[in-house]
Amino acid sequence: LIDIQNFAWEGFGSSGNSRVRPLRIECVSAGSGRAIRFFFRDSDKNEIRVARLLKDGLRSDVGEEYVTEIQVNTSEALPVPFIFAALRKSGGMHWDLGDQAVFSGQIDVSNVEGYWTAECSGTMKQVDLAVTTALLSAHLQGVAEITLNNFLWSQSRIKNVDCECIADRGEIEQVWIDRLVRILGCRVDEAYHHLSGSHARSFQRLGFGLVIDSGGLQLLALPGRSGCLLESQGLPVILEPLQTVTLDRLAWLLSGTRPPAVPGTDVTAWLLSVLPIPNAFR
């Protein structure tokens, strides 16, 4: 049992205004194994738990076989870098969302026979779009809120993503808009003006739903927005595509080359390796 009277998470470049709270770390029994719990003493219902369990509670002839489980269950916002630190053992690629990003919701991760599975639902707030797009060839600026209705990972691949993203103000490079129109089939509306190069335009609202599964990619406007994905000065800039597109077009969108080439970058190479296997190849 470890009690830390004053704990605050401050990432590199953070403002230093993190709430200071008492943190408890304890080792507890968990079925056929042990678990380490991380929780704030003033709110013990919100916790991060890392467990190592004997598979099926049995020992085999070749020795003990273990299952690793990582669980996050929190109704209050916890720093995303803090959660990523707990998930580091899973070996996944953790995309930088900024030092101020926070998460509330549920995450369940497990490893059986070397394969990781994960399921997640919840909300991420204060996502720094400049940091999030820093590894890409084109960039965004602003602060976003992302709602994960469902994220499912199995057998080293994404199985399903269903999420929504909203940013009330920011800047978007024109090349993003051009690619969304050319590659994903978004439609141009009255506030669209073609600007050259990487010139950025300000926006008052960016909002979309994204669904990824073996059937392809759907980019959707949010309810009540009349199909609009991006607004500038109160006018629609681009509208949602009329149909689902193939998953390789997501890699094209992020590749940053013209004509689009894949993998193009390390990011898109990784993405292609983990996207769902299309129904046509099953």
Segments (PLM) and residue ranges:
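Membrane-proximal interfacial segments on either side of biological membranes
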Residues: L1-K45, V50-R282
